[in-house]
Amino acid sequence: MIVELSHPLIKHKVNTARIQDTSAEKLRKTLKELGFMLVYEALKDILLEEKEVRTWIGNKRFNYLNEEEIVFVPILRAGLSFLEGALQVVPNAKVGFLGIKRNEETLESHIYYSRLPELKGKIVVILDPMLATGGTLEVALREILKHSPLKVKSVHAIAAPEGLKRIEEKFKEVEIFVGNVDERLNDKGYIIPGLGDIGDRLYAVSVY
């Protein structure tokens, strides 16, 4: 399932991130805010659990989120920009990390680092600002699905139609939430118009 979110504030922040001379500091702040908004939307269907609590008029039962059932998995490096915002939505969620690198010649991706908590029966939310060819997300999903999660969601600021099609065809059970579906990929596998090299831009590694 693919959901392109229509909220005007999400569109505004995605387009703010496109501006070439946006400082690294402002870009990190913008992506943190996008992480909050996208995760908030992605968890709209989550089920609550009844719990008895003490109130000013005695013990009462209300519905609450079991935060420990949720696991955020940012894709290094750029996915870290979403993590702080995601944890503001669900502060007690568990966090795992996947480092996945794409070969810029073959466009194939491979895992170079994996540190995941228990995923069996959990709701996993993958955090990655961009979904381009879908190669990185495919590798992440294959790794995560080995551990029998209850549900997997993936959130992105932008995505290319080609990558969305690839993931939807191979992983029909995965829910993808995206701030904006961009035009296309270029011959190097970059999203057009995209965000440039978001990892480098976030951490002021280079100017493109």
Swiss-Prot record:
Superkingdom to which the source organism belongs: Bacteria
Catalytic activity, as annotated: UMP + diphosphate = 5-phospho-alpha-D-ribose 1-diphosphate + uracil
Regulation: Allosterically activated by GTP.
Biological process per Gene Ontology, one example term: guanine salvage
Cofactor: Mg(2+)
Binding positions for uracil per the UniProt entry: I191, G196, D197, I198
Keyword field: Allosteric enzyme, Glycosyltransferase, GTP-binding, Magnesium, Nucleotide-binding, Transferase
Residues given in the record as 5-phospho-alpha-D-ribose 1-diphosphate binding sites: R77, R102, D128, P129, M130, L131, A132, T133, G134, G135, T136, D197
InterPro entries in alphabetical order: PRibTrfase_dom, PRTase-like, Upp_B, UPRTase/APRTase, Ura_phspho_trans
Textual note on the cofactor: Binds 1 Mg(2+) ion per subunit. The magnesium is bound as Mg-PRPP.
Pathway(s) annotated for this protein in UniProt: Pyrimidine metabolism; UMP biosynthesis via salvage pathway; UMP from uracil: step 1/1
E.C. number(s) listed in UniProt: 2.4.2.9
GO MF entry, a single one: magnesium ion binding
Gene Ontology terms: cellular component: cytosol
Any Pfam family hit: UPRTase
Enzyme class of the recorded protein, top EC level: transferase
KW Signal (keyword) present: no
Known role: Catalyzes the conversion of uracil and 5-phospho-alpha-D-ribose 1-diphosphate (PRPP) to UMP and diphosphate.
Stated family: Belongs to the UPRTase family.
Name the record gives this protein: Uracil phosphoribosyltransferase
Annotated gene: upp
